[in-house]
Amino acid sequence: MDKFVIRTPRIQNSPQKKDSGGKVYKQATIESLKRVVVVEDIKRWKTMLELPDQTKENLVEALQELKKKIPSREVLKSTRIGHTVNKMRKHSDSEVASLAREVYTEWKTFTEKHSNRPSIEVRSDPKTESLRKNAQKLLSEALELKMDHLLVENIERETFHLCSRLINGPYRRTVRALVFTLKHRAEIRAQVKSGSLPVGTFVQTHKK
């Protein structure tokens, strides 16, 4: 009696058979790593936390982003972000205060245990910082505020963030649009200064 070999098609995605031993790998960028700290982002979140009349939504967002990072002792000292987070532990909103306590405790614990372990810091070059200072100057004049005012810093940092942390065409056009509106639209300027128009919303609607 003849024998035949019958080949059946292999089913690729059979729901009946699962590979329990297989590992799933997820691609990660270097900036997504907990010990890789972009100093600009730390400063941006710091201004969000310190800006008067900041919305709860923005405070929670900033703290949640900070929770994903563990700055080195040097970054904590140079930016004073630890001091800012520490103050937020006494915030009147319980959710904000609780989140701030979590961030502060995690940072403090890690720093004490790994005091000699360096982190990777990403900083802007001098030319970029010079161009950004000029943008802050234009914004301060349009807002009729001093250049070192928190609101001026917050608007510029939000703009820089939305433009992928690059001094490019979109950044320059967005700054010009913001300055024009602040100079010629008194009602918008008043809303931004009072906090009734959140900085994030203001910048987003003028992004070019």
UniProtKB/Swiss-Prot annotation:
Residue span(s) of domain TFIIS N-terminal: 40-114
SMART domains: TFS2N
Localisation: Nucleus
Coarse class of the protein's main subcellular location: nucleus
Family annotation (Pfam families): Med26 (PF08711)
GO cellular component: nucleus
Start and end residues of each TFIIS central domain: 131-208
Transmembrane segments: none
Presence of the UniProt keyword Nucleus in the record: yes
Keywords: Acetylation, Nucleus
Keyword rRNA processing set for record: no
Xref: InterPro entries: TFIIS/CRSP70_N_sub, TFIIS/LEDGF_dom_sf, TFIIS_cen_dom, TFIIS_cen_dom_sf, TFIIS_N
GO annotation, biological process: DNA-templated transcription; regulation of transcription by RNA polymerase II
Modification N-acetylmethionine, positions: M1
Region of interest (Disordered), residue spans: 1-21
Family stated for the protein in its record: Belongs to the TCEANC2 family.
Official protein name in the record: Transcription elongation factor A N-terminal and central domain-containing protein 2
